Amino acid sequence: MRTADREARPGLPSLLLLLLAGAGLSAASPPAAPRFNVSLDSVPELRWLPVLRHYDLDLVRAAMAQVIGDRVPKWVHVLIGKVVLELERFLPQPFTGEIRGMCDFMNLSLADCLLVNLAYESSVFCTSIVAQDSRGHIYHGRNLDYPFGNVLRKLTVDVQFLKNGQIAFTGTTFIGYVGLWTGQSPHKFTVSGDERDKGWWWENAIAALFRRHIPVSWLIRATLSESENFEAAVGKLAKTPLIADVYYIVGGTSPREGVVITRNRDGPADIWPLDPLNGAWFRVETNYDHWKPAPKEDDRRTSAIKALNATGQANLSLEALFQILSVVPVYNNFTIYTTVMSAGSPDKYMTRIRNPSRK
């Protein structure tokens, strides 16, 4: 998908072309996210430093301050500042080591670096699609929507995590953030996460951290690192205790290997697999339980379904999926990036920065 762009391509069904035209999309190709290697063979405190050296640390610090100031309640900031050293003992490695290493490098407090990593967990509005084409190939795409696009678009990166010099898994993240909302284990599975807002987020999250529950994006990364196949990944993502509710979308490499997992903090609320033999060749997840109507003021779901049906199963590809994720309002003013991926073709993992000129 390195050549994917927002220009309509020959072969796309005419209805999808009309949807794209109605969205007023530019023909300019959105820029690809920068790609870096992070060696998991390095100690956690040092492994991100080669990446940080490519960035203006004042920009990174300003972005973190903006996110904390807007997304973290003052009582949480005060509380974490008092208990951060105790809380650190409850959090899993390598994440805490990586956070500590980056905040030392940037001369920031451990409390602030931990808070910004938690803040990114709390407000991620997204659209994820997993689908199977008529030949049995599995495709997975996602839009990540978030405020602060003026700075976060400059800090979005694709990271290849290396073990013994080989790519163990790939993910998309923001500089300073150790979790992954989007990722791929080559020739095994792909994962994306969408927020499931159930209220009282900070109160529940902090209490769960002290019970050794894991942040939702950290579990995606741990699953990419540890799970050997699609089935194992689904089991880990469905059952591991979390600090917040979430939707996990998983794609595999074989026919029917696609699922949306609706999570409560303590376990699965629903498992919604592909069922292509009965016509369900795709699943669309935004930020709402799939068995309930999407709210009229945020119905990205219906637009995505219409675009998928306009494309058709026989015409599905990573490029077509990118175009589907470019239909308004699936693609909107808050969209930071679009990633398309297929675990069976891991070299085609591609993230493109959306709205690059928007302030």
Curated annotation (Swiss-Prot):
Disulphide bonds in the chain: 103-113
Annotated effect of mutating residue 287 to D: Loss of autoproteolytic cleavage and loss of enzyme activity
Membrane-protein topology: Peripheral membrane protein
Catalytic residues, chain numbering: 126
Family matches, as InterPro entries: Acid_ceramidase-like (IPR016699), Acid_ceramidase_N (IPR029130), CBAH/NAAA_C (IPR029132)
N-terminal signal peptide: 1-28
Gene Ontology biological process terms, A to Z: fatty acid metabolic process; lipid catabolic process; N-acylethanolamine metabolic process; N-acylphosphatidylethanolamine metabolic process; sphingosine metabolic process
UniProt site (Important for enzyme activity): 142, 287
Function: Degrades bioactive fatty acid amides to their corresponding acids, with the following preference: N-palmitoylethanolamine > N-myristoylethanolamine > N-lauroylethanolamine = N-stearoylethanolamine > N-arachidonoylethanolamine > N-oleoylethanolamine. Also exhibits weak hydrolytic activity against the ceramides N-lauroylsphingosine and N-palmitoylsphingosine.
Descriptive protein name: N-acylethanolamine-hydrolyzing acid amidase
Organism: Homo sapiens (Human)
Gene designation: NAAA
